[in-house]
Amino acid sequence: DATFSVASYFFDDDGVLAQDTKIIDNGILVSGISDTLSALQLGTAPTGNGRRESYKRKSYTRMTNTFFSPGKAKLSDMIKSIKHGYLLAQTNNGMEDPKNWGIQCTAQYGREILDGQFTGKIIAPVVMSGYVIDLLNSISAVSRDFEVIGSGSCGKGYKEWVRVSDGGPYLKAKVKIG
């Protein structure tokens, strides 16, 4: 959603009006994001996601403020329902492998949960990895708690960075951590 949070903008770097683009709705992929060129190639309307680091650079299709919408679950009920797991906090980066549907994200720390209670054990840092489809299919609860922080960035290689916001609700999901 390019119109929400600190990293928002009115027009993308192709001159397209910024908008809220719903990518997944009720578990179904309903849209992607595009800049003007990729939209032309796909035969779709651009979504206002053509962004570049500076006027010296080419625009690329880039994420904006990307997050899950809030759900209905109470965080306390989600924690109580966990036999063994971790509440991960302060995610600070992630990357995807679009060819193989892989994903990797990092959180500053995780608080261990055993039989629905925090044990006091902290692990840090936490790297989550897996297959996007498996992760999305494993989501069993989405909290009503919702927070978006405008301190992120989206990179394309070592020189192409644009500001984004991240965050959202808590998700109860199965992921591989290490």
Q: What are these model-predicted stretches?
A:
Residues 1-178:
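N-terminal small-residue-enriched
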